[in-house]
């Protein structure tokens, strides 16, 4: 089961009072519901691919409105042949939609009814219902952090974005081919959203994976940095050794000034160590890294003169 499915299963087990239940159900029906006419009777159908979400819709409708609800199961025929669950009620359809702020004076509204988000708990419940209806979140182990809520209606998606940002989540709004999404890209904001809607187990798992992942990335960056520094040190040492070998072949190390001769011999004998370590091995006393670098640069310059056939003065 995916991280998003586990999270939705957790959300459907949250106990809420009637006002918060209405807020959650309002989002679920607005986003996944449809009104049809059958035998001169209005029917509400609420569709989802998540079995636990279907049970949540079923229980909320029965609890709030005390009407008969049936759950139908259909097999999706395209692409992934998942089950589709349809919660259907034929009783008080228009009254239910009116009470949930979806139908006003016989007209469907696409924005969020202010009566459904009157206080903090109702806002959280509405966002929870919206996530159950059209939400998805990447597994935190994947390459990018992403949480989104899809809505068919742009007005509603913009309302969700605004509602999310009332909690400083830095949500963004984006139009898609068949609707719009409100989405989050920052790991910390996704964590805040999970906490906001009551997904505490999902939050713990998300944070555990994120901490391990961030630690792994930090270690990788450190290793890469150290590897780059090591490669740089080795490359510089190889060039220095080549220069020293050329000097030895052409004029002999014994003809170098004492301060250069000892450094040249130390570098050839200890090619793998850093300049700081090399400087500590000088017989006349430790030499700083910059001092060693200066002497080795002198040896490189001397080798370059030999390569270019220039006159050499020791």
Swiss-Prot record:
Matching InterPro entries: Homing_endonucl, Sporu_reg_WhiA_N_dom, Sporulation_regulator_WhiA, Sporulation_regulator_WhiA_C, WhiA_LAGLIDADG_dom
Entry keywords, A to Z: Cell cycle, Cell division, DNA-binding
Pfam families cross-referenced by the UniProt entry: HTH_WhiA, LAGLIDADG_WhiA, WhiA_N
Gene3D superfamilies found in the cross-reference section: Homing endonucleases
Residue ranges: DNA binding: 274-308
GO biological process per UniProt: cell division; regulation of sporulation
Source domain of life: Bacteria
Gene Ontology molecular-function annotations: DNA binding
Family classification: Belongs to the WhiA family.
Function: Involved in cell division and chromosome segregation.
Record's protein name: Probable cell division protein WhiA
